[in-house]
């Protein structure tokens, strides 16, 4: 089922002349940096959809995960949403959330997030009356402790 040629290039389109090609900053970087095609201002506590003006065709059996950049995370900037489905072909947008205390400016050409390609499995779902029990059971949200 996972017959995927990892050497096949991923096709993308620059929708406008403002778009920058996604790039990796090192040979072993997990993600490709995505760039803002426009200038935006994000006040503290607010969020903004940032357009890249890039559209692309995801590899078969993969989806694109939009992940934060560590340098922006240090400034209180996070990502909302973050999934690009295999069959999506539109302008890739990134929701930036300003959790900081200062207004955050996004300049045209700024690196705003990273795109990571991940394999996906499309299971068939089956409703049942109960699930197999485990030692953990329904314990979640901190139930395993800090240490």
From Swiss-Prot:
DUTP binds at residues 68-70, 82-85, 88, 93, 95, 111. Keywords: Early protein, Hydrolase, Magnesium, Metal-binding, Nucleotide metabolism. It catalyses: dUTP + H2O = dUMP + diphosphate + H(+). Its EC number is 3.6.1.23. GO terms for biological process: dUMP biosynthetic process; dUTP catabolic process. The keyword Cytoplasm does not apply. Mg(2+) binds at residue 24. It holds the Pfam family dUTPase. It is an enzyme of class 3 (hydrolase). Its cofactor is Mg(2+). Coiled coil: none annotated. This enzyme is involved in nucleotide metabolism: it produces dUMP, the immediate precursor of thymidine nucleotides and it decreases the intracellular concentration of dUTP so that uracil cannot be incorporated into DNA. NCBIfam families: dut, PRK00601.1. This is Deoxyuridine 5'-triphosphate nucleotidohydrolase. It comes from Camelpox virus (strain CMS).
């Amino acid at each position: 089922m996972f017959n995927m040629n990892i050497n096949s290039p991923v096709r993308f389109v620059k929708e406008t002349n403002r778009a920058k090609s996604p790039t990796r900053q090192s040979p072993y970087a997990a993600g490709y940096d995505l760039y803002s095609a426009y200038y935006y201002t994000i006040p503290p506590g607010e969020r903004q959809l940032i357009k890249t003006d890039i559209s692309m065709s995801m590899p078969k059996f993969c989806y694109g995960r939009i992940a934060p950049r560590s340098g922006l995370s240090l400034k209180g900037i996070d990502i909302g949403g973050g999934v690009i489905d295999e069959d999506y072909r539109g302008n890739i947008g990134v929701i930036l959330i300003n959790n900081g205390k200062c207004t955050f400016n996004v300049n045209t050409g700024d690196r705003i997030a990273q795109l990571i390609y991940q394999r996906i499995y499309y299971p068939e779902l089956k409703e049942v009356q109960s699930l197999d029990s485990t030692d953990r059971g329904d314990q979640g949200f901190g139930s395993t402790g800090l240490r």
